[in-house]
Curated annotation (Swiss-Prot):
Organism lineage: Bacteria, Bacillati, Bacillota, Bacilli, Bacillales
Superkingdom in the source lineage: Bacteria
GO BP, sorted A to Z: tetrahydrofolate biosynthetic process
Enzyme Commission number(s): 3.5.4.16
HAMAP family: GTP_cyclohydrol_B (MF_01527_B)
Pathway info: Cofactor biosynthesis; 7,8-dihydroneopterin triphosphate biosynthesis; 7,8-dihydroneopterin triphosphate from GTP: step 1/1
Name of the protein this chain belongs to: GTP cyclohydrolase FolE2
Keywords for this protein: Hydrolase
Enzyme class per UniProt: hydrolase
Gene: folE2
């Protein structure tokens, strides 16, 4: 049995089974290597979307940097075998400046670069990240950082936008109207998870504070907003406000819809509210879809 010098890293590697590279016969330079993806012949079908998923990259949401999880895709004609996936990352890097800004205009430019680099007509992106924002306690007005989850969706064909979506998921407090009605005192309440997917008008300019307007519709219609910091006067106010504004999941999604339907820059929306019931072993939920 061969003895290896275990005092060296290379010796320890070989002791655990590593071997020396062989002298191969295949090309080692890019220009000499076969590019299978670029093979051209009849491959029977066009592909609507092909690309990468779960690409984690730094993003900028307003003034905060966070991690974004991307899915990128392009179309593929039937006479091409595949796409060069490394060009997707190269396209992203051309727009990277301490993070990719999560705004529709920036994502549009990334997709235009992707179209050019991939030599395809259609391109799309979906990216999810954490949105951080300043939140003040309701009575003492103490500032802290709140958060919600956002997902941007954008697709283009040529220079035309074919899909423009924003999804926000936020948590709220809901107090049970039935519990309040039948009880001599108190009422059960719980955390509710509200998800709103909006379909944004592709031909109309969107308002500057669109995220805040959607989030306000989600939170203001609940029994109470959630806060990072609550002192005793704040806790008293939050508790009393929830009691003053009882909400079933059905109530909440209808009230949110009543606000969203007034936004002329939306073509429609999907709403779901899921209550993590505090007195049951199950959750309660409601869903609503609306198209103008």
């Amino acid at each position: 049995m061969t003895e290896f010098d275990l005092s060296t890293r290379e010796g320890r590697w070989k002791h655990f089974g590593s071997v020396d590279p062989i002298e191969g016969t295949k090309p080692t330079t890019k220009n000499e290597m076969t590019d299978l993806q670029s093979t051209h012949k009849d491959f029977l079908f066009e592909i609507e979307e092909v690309g990468i998923k779960n690409l984690v990259y730094p993003v900028l949401v307003d003034q905060y940097q966070t991690a974004g999880t991307f899915s990128f895709s392009t179309s593929l004609t039937k006479d091409e075998k595949g796409i060069n996936m490394s060009r997707i990352i190269e396209s992203v890097e051309k727009h990277y400046d301490n993070g990719i800004e999560l705004e529709f205009n920036t994502l549009y430019q990334v997709l235009r670069t992707l179209q050019t680099n991939m030599k395809q007509n259609a391109a799309g992106v979906d990216v999810s990240g954490k949105w951080f924002f300043d939140r003040y306690s309701p009575t003492t007005n103490i500032k802290a950082v709140g958060n919600a989850d956002v997902t941007y969706g954008l697709a283009i064909d040529g220079d035309k936008v074919t899909r423009k979506e924003l999804t926000i998921e936020a948590t709220v407090t809901t107090l049970c109207p039935c519990s309040k009605e039948i009880s001599e005192y108190s009422a059960h309440n719980q955390r509710g998870v509200v998800t709103v997917k909006t379909y944004i008008n592709k031909d109309q300019d969107i308002v500057d504070d669109y995220k805040n307007k959607i989030l306000d519709a989600m939170e203001a219609n609940a029994s109470s907003i959630l806060y990072p910091i609550l002192k005793r006067p704040d806790e008293k106010r939050v508790t009393e406000r929830a009691y003053e504004n009882p909400r079933f999941v059905e109530d909440l999604i209808r009230l949110i819809a009543a606000d969203l339907v007034e936004f002329d820059w939306l073509d429609g929306f999907d709403i779901e509210c899921r209550n993590e019931e505090s007195i049951h072993q199950h959750d309660a939920f409601a869903k609503l879809k609306y198209r103008k």
